[in-house]
């Protein structure tokens, strides 16, 4: 009798464990898609206007937490609800912004003080400019470690880890 009880407990434990483990087989990490746009979540966008309110929730009746005042500022969308996008900036601050205030044109923010812009994507390449911290530059293209940006009439390559607004593994032609 004691042996049957132990066997039945082990059997139940195995069944329970298989219910938890079986769904994990064949699971592949696919990019999450926005419920409204079907575009990747998260993704980077930019501020289309000179001033935009970031609200606590996705409607005009929600309190304004932040006012963004830099046109072309890169923002990361990490949620969608109807005509609203939940965004965060390079400091991790944000809120809900109406989609009409955002653009798919990509910009990046310079993280490092006087980031060296180079002629080619190599640490040995000629420095053609030094871009000040917090400048906003147009994102042109990216390879594994470098991105080509356009800033103040200069077009050159900067290390990917010196900018905000592009993902570590992102490639852009």
Cite the ranges covered by each PLM segment.
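Beta-strand-rich domains and repeat architectures in extracellular enzymes and scaffolds
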Residues: 63-64
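SH3-family beta-barrel domains
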Residues: 28-56, 67-71, 78-81, 85-93, ...
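Bacterial N-terminal signal peptides that target proteins for export
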Residues: 1-14
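Bacterial N-terminal signal peptides
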Residues: 11-23
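Glycine-centered signal
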Residues: 5, 25-26
